[in-house]
Amino acid sequence: EEQEAYTYDVDKAKELMKEAGYEDGFKLTLWGDNTTQEIKGMTFISQQLAQIGIEVDVQPMEPATVSDKIYVDKEDAEINMWYVNWSASDFTMDGSLRSLLYSTMCPPTSANTAYFNDADFDKDMDEGLATANEEEQAKYYGDAQKIAWEACPWLFLGNDQIIYSTKSYLSGVYVSPDGAFNFANATLAQ
């Protein structure tokens, strides 16, 4: 099921900041990998948040350094924001959501850096994993996705479009959602 896109409303955001006691804004740190794409994304986020008084210190780092800083016990966590790309290489809803948002999948063993904890979300994830019926899976995972979208523990910004081509004599090449190429079934026409 498709979700309605989040709305862009600077005035509403300022109003919510005021209600939360942050009328004068605040400062935070945004971590991410030091690739050109990641730095551009983090810079864009910092520009957007500046409009509502949030001063962002963008800190691009080597991926291993980001990982070392992210995957620590909660009491040692220093994370404010993390700019990250994610895809489900296994092509399952469970793979898309469980490690990011399931209540027990927090650092240091997994990526729920929002420390999201929603019993209904967890129940839907468990029910989806427990059944082999595709219609039931679609319902449970759809419900879990709706909970995550509405709670917004992470801000889901967009989807990359992976475009690739092959020669007409090559078949069986597959590209996963994370951009990895799979040549296991590749064949060349004679």
What is each stretch, according to the model?
Residues 30, 49, 70, 97, ...:
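Hydrophobic, well-ordered secondary-structure elements that form the walls
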Residues 1-11, 22, 71-77, 98-126, ...:
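Short, solvent-exposed loop/beta-turn-alpha elements that line the ligand-binding surface or hinge
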Residues 19-40, 78-85, 131-167:
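Bilobed periplasmic-binding protein-like "clamshell/Venus-flytrap" ligand-binding domains
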Residues 30, 58-60, 108:
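A structural preference for short, hydrophobic beta-strand core positions in alpha/beta folds
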Residues 47-104, 140:
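Periplasmic binding protein-like
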Residues 1-47, 51, 120-123, 139, ...:
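Append "and occasionally in soluble cytosolic enzymes with long acidic Gly/Pro-rich linkers
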Residues 41-42, 93-97, 169:
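Short, solvent-exposed loop/turn and secondary-structure capping segments
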Residues 50, 54, 71, 75, ...:
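Hydrophobic alpha-helix feature that most strongly marks membrane-spanning transmembrane helices
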